[in-house]
Amino acid sequence: MRVAIIDYGSGNLRSATKAFERAAHESGISAEIDLTCDAQRVASADRIVLPGVGAYADCRRGLDAVPGMVEALNDTVLKKARPFLGICVGMQLMSERGLEKTVTNGLGWIAGDVREMVPSDASLKIPQIGWNRIHVKHSHPIFDGIPTGDDGLHAYFVHSYMLDAKNASDVLAVTDYGGDVTAAVGRDNMVGTQFHPEKSQLLGLSFIANFLKWKP
């Protein structure tokens, strides 16, 4: 199995690659973790990971700048139904639009917009930086065996914007930061996380292992 982590100039690429290699090794999964900017290698991969940090518009421009990458993603994820994971802004790009400073079109895979977080508690600072628990809204194999909820493990977040999904069924999990904030989305063969599994220690490694084993 070959897992393509897309290098388009954004994301914690080294830590993501290392986390996927470690999760595969510790779970006894035979997987080649391929950090690549080659659209053809993405198109032929068994699983695809789209990381991302920074501004939505910058990440979209970076993705568009890689020849054939958006086309490869649409073909491989939507038509060939290969398992896909978006991380942080990589998840946000799954949406229809980003509303950060300007309106930027996303990939349009998950109905909804990415908008600025406005916590109900004014003492909560933006961006949300640090550890927070996640609460699963819809059961999904990606969370199998992972303690969640009030007594669960913590995930690591760094973000100022959130995906406001139009369909509640697409929201797999939330976190509480002055109100519910989308922590994970999923539909068909695609999932995305606002938190960083590559930085989320035990929860993150278990999550990555579940993604590698997932058969949508």
From Swiss-Prot:
Enzyme Commission numbers on file: 4.3.2.10, 3.5.1.2
Source organism, top-level taxon: Bacteria
CDD domains noted in UniProt: GATase1_IGP_Synthase
A cellular component term, taken from the record's GO annotations: cytoplasm
Keyword tRNA processing carried by entry: no
Reaction(s) this enzyme catalyzes, per UniProt: 5-[(5-phospho-1-deoxy-D-ribulos-1-ylimino)methylamino]-1-(5-phospho-beta-D-ribosyl)imidazole-4-carboxamide + L-glutamine = D-erythro-1-(imidazol-4-yl)glycerol 3-phosphate + 5-amino-1-(5-phospho-beta-D-ribosyl)imidazole-4-carboxamide + L-glutamate + H(+); L-glutamine + H2O = L-glutamate + NH4(+)
Keywords for the protein's UniProt record, in alphabetical order: Amino-acid biosynthesis, Cytoplasm, Glutamine amidotransferase, Histidine biosynthesis, Hydrolase, Lyase
Any one GO molecular function term: glutaminase activity
Methyltransferase in keyword set: no
PROSITE patterns from the UniProt entry: GATASE_TYPE_1
Location within or outside the cell: Cytoplasm
Function: IGPS catalyzes the conversion of PRFAR and glutamine to IGP, AICAR and glutamate. The HisH subunit catalyzes the hydrolysis of glutamine to glutamate and ammonia as part of the synthesis of IGP and AICAR. The resulting ammonia molecule is channeled to the active site of HisF.
Protein name: Imidazole glycerol phosphate synthase subunit HisH
Lineage start: Bacteria, Pseudomonadati, Pseudomonadota, Alphaproteobacteria, Hyphomicrobiales
